[in-house]
């Protein structure tokens, strides 16, 4: 099973980390039923300078909203954070309790997909 917005949200929820999903300016408890949310991420990064088409960005540490400037135009697919950045980017957000733990889980899923 590839890492998509839906599988990432399910994984984070199963581990008690997911608080909310922000999608199309709506807050919800799960990813809506939209085929576009089943497109696999091309990469996971926590460095905004490396975001490219299809990237999942994990916002951790001393992350600042201004780091997100221009990322929609570079292909940001979604972000994981403990803060809502929907005022800065259009990409869906997975709001979690601990972005570092979330990074560990989704990175493992990308490198070792579930069967």
How would you describe each model-predicted region?
Residues 1-109, 113:
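N-terminal leader/targeting and accessory segments in enzymes
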């Amino acid at each position: 099973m590839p890492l998509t917005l839906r599988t990432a949200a399910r994984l984070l929820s199963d581990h008690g980390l997911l608080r909310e999903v922000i999608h199309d300016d709506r807050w919800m408890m799960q990813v809506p039923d939209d085929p576009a949310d089943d497109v696999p991420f091309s990469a996971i990064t926590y460095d905004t300078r490396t975001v490219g088409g299809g990237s999942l960005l994990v916002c951790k540490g001393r992350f600042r909203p201004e780091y997100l400037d221009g990322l929609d135009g570079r292909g940001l697919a979604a972000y994981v954070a403990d803060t809502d950045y929907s005022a800065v980017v259009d990409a869906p957000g997975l709001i979690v309790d601990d972005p570092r733990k979330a990074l560990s889980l989704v990175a493992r899923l990308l490198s070792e997909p579930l069967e």
